[in-house]
Amino acid sequence: MLTLARQQQRQNIRWLLCLSVLMLLALLLSLCAGEQWISPGDWFTPRGELFVWQIRLPRTLAVLLVGAALAISGAVMQALFENPLAEPGLLGVSNGAGVGLIAAVLLGQGQLPNWALGLCAIAGALIITLILLRFARRHLSTSRLLLAGVALGIICSALMTWAIYFSTSVDLRQLMYWMMGGFGGVDWRQSWLMLALIPVLLWICCQSRPMNMLALGEISARQLGLPMWFWRNVLVAATGWMVGVSVALAGAIGFIGLVIPHILRLCGLTDHRVLLPGCALAGASALLLADIVARLALAAAELPIGVVTATLGAPVFIWLLLKAGR
């Protein structure tokens, strides 16, 4: 038994090391790649200072943090709701952030600065989160709380559809670009949004013990003495914050929160002491690679990153499911 535990521990360490190397390689490639390839030796030239440090670095950091936040949010949702199909958009938080952003675009007639749009997206996500916490205080079961989140998401989706239908052509272009996701407008002015993600990410990565108990199921977690009401509220609030900030930075990006935790579990990373940091590393790496593809796929335009993540990731996910089912 001890030998098996040591083997599993060594395997977990190897996985984390491999994911760390992958993330570093993706980060370096993201800084080098673009319309002009700039190798690390040219980063401190005048051209490198402009393209790498002023344009590519803030975008790369935003992609890294958003990928980590979405993947960790997916892992938290899947443990909390005991559902492998749970993901950040399931509770309606992503759509809530979208409603806040769309309201800001329409009411501000496209004239609001980026920081104001970001605050409105966060406010929309937090409003949905507060509604969910109100349901949670009524001691609803996990399944009913999940259904409440799905219903809120449907309502927010309907509101976004109505807003797009009545918007002008200029607003519609901006809204459609947001709904497909993208990091094209990210620069150092959004650094406050990036900083807002870091403490919550670090805190959740340190909560492996309650997450492992939640993964056993609600009944087992209660029997082990876990205060379900407290942890449900805290985790829903933390997820709402991360998703709201991510939407404010990049718009709606699917797939990462659903598939990354599931893929890592299929690879044997079930302990949240390893799964949570693994999700952060894998989510950051996957979104960095998707962002590179989005930038380089077309010569004169940039693909929406949400389309890239779904196109590249869905076949891999299906292959892993078929492989695990053999």
Swiss-Prot record:
Keywords: Cell inner membrane, Cell membrane, Membrane, Transmembrane, Transmembrane helix, Transport. GO terms for biological process: cobalamin transport. GO terms for molecular function: vitamin transmembrane transporter activity. The chain crosses the membrane at residues 13-35, 55-77, 90-107, 111-133, 146-168, 188-205, 242-264, 274-296, 303-322. Gene3D superfamilies: ABC transporter involved in vitamin B12 uptake, BtuC (1.10.3470.10). One of its GO terms (cellular component) is plasma membrane. This is Vitamin B12 import system permease protein BtuC. Belongs to the binding-protein-dependent transport system permease family. FecCD subfamily. InterPro entries: ABC_BtuC-like, ABC_transptr_BtuC, ABC_transptr_permease_BtuC. It comes from Shigella flexneri. The keyword Membrane applies. Its main location: membrane. The complex is composed of two ATP-binding proteins (BtuD), two transmembrane proteins (BtuC) and a solute-binding protein (BtuF). Disulfide bonds: none annotated. The gene is btuC. Part of the ABC transporter complex BtuCDF involved in vitamin B12 import. Involved in the translocation of the substrate across the membrane. It comes from the Bacteria. It is found in: Cell inner membrane. It is a multi-pass membrane protein.
